[in-house]
């Protein structure tokens, strides 16, 4: 039986971030809608052509999005909240994504356990009419180039519901969507597609079993389209849902064999003879080449159970960059073992070709393939190249529990820490980076300016930022982070064991792209990383300047990590480096140090049974970094896009003096969770959404702060934006901060009056 190949999605931003540039030009009225759509279609066409050239048999299409594919499907199914219905077309689309005219955007949160963000649909009874026209047109264009290889990718109905905020009865919502999905599938059948991928990653969640009846009734309805359905899951295993998922009326079921325990489940339960198994064997979320021996072992086991398989990446390839061959400045032993999207296509095709060209799957025979032998040799060369640091290894071996503890408990530390006005105001750390600031880094990289000239220019930006914060009236200042291209990249560039790409961009959300570092060896800090800029800022003001660090867990979760040692060990190596930085900042006069952990929660395994293991080492890594701080030094941390209710005990164990939170876009849910848990430490309540260009009014901010005061003791509360301000423009930031300070003054007076009346 010939083994076919498939893809489940592809990078969306363009090899040179063409979509990002087009979006930002469109938002600044420098590009019209027609040109924006043309850019997106050109990227789509290039993606299809590449997959066709490589020889992929079933090419997933329709996943490219101007901002977010969940938003795309929300609009197609008429899930449009009333506040956006006065807009139409792209104006409506981007109002939902970014907010407009004082109307807030949809809530944004992380896509499962990845660093991609999606916009949370709000489902009420008032559905708008469906409109699949853009998707159907995409399918037609794909068929023109790809013919029967074109396979539409559709976000599954139960995953769409699971990701949504339901404001109606679940059964009604399922019934509505079920009928409209059937309409869509019939439209696709009329176009002559050979199959449709229904992406249901929600099936790997623990609660999937409770949706069993909904899945069964939904797929019983969808089968009426008489169209082959390919059920796609990824990010983890099916768990307890395995037996009934195998009985769903679909022709192919795809599973992720790079995460979770699907291989063990396959051994236990077998696989139905009437279905094809989609084998997600190439890791769609990391950037390393396959380990031939390991991959062939897995495939040997799978084929001993079912011969009817197709091969594909474990997930969409949107989580990896385009092409590792472009990274010519990386050391050759490292570059040779990298696999970005284009290389992963090659790996899928290679494995299928090797299996199809051999009689049977004996590993010894298969491993004689010259291409697989070459990959083995590349891995051996890399292992000799990858740095090992004996000092770091010794420090890890000698760690004790005392290294993870602050000298005094929180209640005693607080009395020693700086005294500030009630409800002190601050920011999360970064300020807008203009084109001129970004150009400074480019000039330095090209050796067009010296390091001294670069630092002098950065110092001017710091001085301007400090003056601005003083003029606005903030209580605790920051230096603005103008020297940092990215909160992870900046630190990684100064740590041994990290490597950086030139073209390794991936989408975080909308037009925001990041270049995750690559961890390839032991991590150490050769010299201080942030002390110089902190000292410059603190010398310019009598107010406290908060020093800014990125935490070890966020650096792990936002990097492409090693696969030869546990992530926990890599996190502790980073924590040791940050621990030394905290000590140096204290010695330089820092009274407040923020260790950001915005990605703490996103690293949670999708199944709660594995949470404690992750949270144990994640919290320990933070505590190791912060534990060196003196009791009079106030340690802050920041978390965004987080639901805290189910991990609050672990957040408390971080033992941070001040926790700042994303809050405004989640309708205060985060605030309420912290309140319900009886959290005792100080909380920086995110009072406005920095991901929207809208400037919050004083009245809006006053109402937000009143909610905070109603839920937390005033002496617990700090006032800050939701997140860093780097991606905003100065003309948005300045009035927003002024309004925030003005609103805080109003609330301070109300709190004082309330105390006097008590």
Curated annotation (Swiss-Prot):
Sequence positions that bind 5-methyltetrahydropteroyltri-L-glutamate: 17-20, 110, 512-513, 558, 602
Keyword terms of this UniProt record: Amino-acid biosynthesis, Metal-binding, Methionine biosynthesis, Methyltransferase, Repeat, Transferase, Zinc
Gene3D superfamilies noted in UniProt: 3.20.20.210
InterPro entries: Cbl-indep_Met_Synth_N, Cobalamin-indep_Met_synthase, Met_Synth_C/arc, UROD/MetE-like_sf
Chemical reaction(s) catalysed: 5-methyltetrahydropteroyltri-L-glutamate + L-homocysteine = tetrahydropteroyltri-L-glutamate + L-methionine
SUPFAM superfamilies per record: UROD/MetE-like
Segments forming a coiled coil: none
Protein name: 5-methyltetrahydropteroyltriglutamate--homocysteine methyltransferase
Pathway(s): Amino-acid biosynthesis; L-methionine biosynthesis via de novo pathway; L-methionine from L-homocysteine (MetE route): step 1/1
CDD domains: CIMS_C_terminal_like, CIMS_N_terminal_like
Cofactor(s) annotated in UniProt: Zn(2+)
Binding site for Zn(2+): 638, 640, 662, 723
Function statement: Catalyzes the transfer of a methyl group from 5-methyltetrahydrofolate to homocysteine resulting in methionine formation.
Annotated NCBIfam families: met_syn_B12ind, PRK05222.1
Ligand binding (L-homocysteine): 428-430, 481, 596
Cysteine-cysteine disulfides: none
EC numbers on record: 2.1.1.14
Statement: the UniProt record of this protein carries the keyword Transferase: yes
Cofactor info, note text: Binds 1 zinc ion per subunit.
GO molecular function terms listed in the Swiss-Prot or TrEMBL record: 5-methyltetrahydropteroyltriglutamate-homocysteine S-methyltransferase activity; zinc ion binding
PANTHER family in UniProt: 5-METHYLTETRAHYDROPTEROYLTRIGLUTAMATE--HOMOCYSTEINE METHYLTRANSFERASE
Native source organism of the sequence: Thermosynechococcus vestitus (strain NIES-2133 / IAM M-273 / BP-1)
């Amino acid at each position: 039986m010939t083994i076919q190949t498939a893809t489940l999605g592809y990078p969306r931003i363009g090899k040179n971030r063409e979509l990002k540039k087009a979006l930002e030009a469109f938002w600044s009225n420098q590009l019209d809608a027609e040109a924006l759509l043309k850019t997106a279609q050109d990227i789509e066409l290039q993606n299809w052509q590449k997959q066709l050239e490589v020889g992929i048999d079933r090419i997933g299409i329709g996943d490219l999005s101007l901002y977010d594919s969940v938003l795309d499907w929300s609009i197609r199914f008429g899930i449009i909240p009333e506040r956006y219905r006065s807009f139409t077309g792209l104006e409506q689309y981007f109002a939902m994504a970014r907010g407009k005219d004082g109307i807030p955007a949809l809530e944004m949160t992380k896509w499962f356990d990845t660093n991609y963000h999606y916009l949370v649909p709000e489902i009420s009874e008032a559905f708008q009419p469906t409109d699949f026209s853009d998707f159907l047109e995409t399918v037609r264009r794909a068929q023109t180039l790809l013919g029967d290889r074109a396979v539409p990718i559709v976000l599954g109905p139960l995953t769409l519901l699971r990701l949504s905020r339901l404001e109606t009865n679940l059964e009604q919502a399922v019934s509505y969507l079920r009928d409209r999905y059937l309409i869509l599938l019939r439209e696709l059948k009329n176009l002559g597609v050979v199959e449709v991928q229904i992406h249901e990653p929600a099936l790997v969640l623990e609660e999937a079993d409770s949706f069993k009846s909904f899945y069964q009734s939904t797929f019983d309805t969808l089968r009426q389209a008489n169209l082959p359905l390919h059920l796609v899951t990824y990010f983890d295993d099916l768990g307890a849902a395995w037996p009934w998922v195998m009985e769903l009326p679909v022709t192919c079921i795809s599973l992720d064999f790079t995460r979770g325990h699907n291989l063990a489940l396959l051994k236990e339960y077998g696989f139905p003879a009437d279905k094809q198994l989609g084998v997600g064997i190439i890791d769609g979320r990391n950037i390393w080449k396959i380990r031939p021996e390991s991959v062939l072992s897995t495939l040997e086991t799978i084929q001993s159970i079912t011969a009817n398989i197709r091969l594909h990446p474990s997930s969409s390839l949107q989580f990896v960059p385009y092409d590792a061959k472009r990274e010519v400045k990386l050391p050759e032993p490292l570059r040779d073992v990298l696999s970005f999207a284009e290389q992963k296509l090659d790996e899928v095709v290679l494995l299928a070709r090797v299996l199809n060209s051999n009689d049977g799957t004996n590993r010894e025979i298969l491993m004689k393939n010259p291409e697989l032998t070459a990959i083995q040799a590349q891995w051996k060369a890399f292992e000799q190249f990858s740095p090992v640091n004996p000092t770091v290894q010794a420090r890890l071996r000698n760690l004790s529990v005392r290294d993870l503890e602050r000298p005094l408990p929180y209640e005693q530390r607080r009395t020693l820490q700086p005294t500030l006005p009630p409800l002190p105001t601050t920011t999360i750390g970064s300020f807008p980076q203009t084109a001129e600031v970004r150009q400074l880094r480019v000039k330095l990289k090209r050796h067009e300016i010296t390091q001294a000239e670069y630092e002098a220019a950065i110092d001017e930006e710091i001085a301007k930022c400090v003056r601005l914060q003083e003029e606005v009236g903030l209580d605790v200042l920051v230096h603005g982070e103008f020297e940092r291209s990215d909160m992870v990249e900046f630190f990684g560039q100064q740590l041994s064991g990290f490597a950086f790409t030139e073209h390794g961009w991936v989408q975080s959300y909308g037009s925001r792209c990041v270049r995750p570092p690559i961890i390839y060896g032991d991590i150490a800090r050769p010299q201080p990383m942030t002390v110089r800029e902190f000292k410059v800022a603190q010398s310019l003001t009598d107010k406290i300047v908060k020093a800014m660090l990125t935490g070890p867990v966020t650096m792990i979760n936002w990097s492409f990590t090693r696969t030869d040692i546990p992530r926990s060990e890599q996190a502790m190596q980073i924590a040791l480096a940050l621990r030394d930085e905290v000590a140096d900042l204290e010695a330089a006069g820092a009274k407040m140090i923020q260790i950001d952990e915005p990605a703490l929660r996103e690293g949670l395994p999708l199944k709660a049974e594995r949470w404690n293991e992750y949270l144990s080492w994640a919290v320990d890594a933070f505590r190791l970094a912060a534990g060196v701080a003196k009791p009079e030094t106030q340690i802050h941390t920041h978390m965004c896009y987080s639901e805290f209710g189910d991990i609050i005990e672990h957040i408390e164990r971080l033992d941070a003096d001040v926790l700042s939170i994303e809050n405004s876009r989640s309708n205060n849910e985060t605030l309420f969770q912290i309140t319900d848990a009886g959290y005792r430490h100080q909380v920086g309540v995110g009072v406005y959404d920095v991901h929207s260009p809208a400037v919050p009014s004083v009245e809006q901010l006053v109402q937000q702060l009143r909610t905070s005061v109603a839920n937390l003791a005033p002496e617990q509360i700090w006032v800050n934006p939701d997140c860093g301000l780097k991606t905003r423009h100065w003309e948005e930031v300045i009035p927003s901060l002024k309004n925030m300070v003005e609103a805080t003054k109003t609330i301070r007076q109300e709190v004082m009056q309330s105390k006097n009346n008590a």
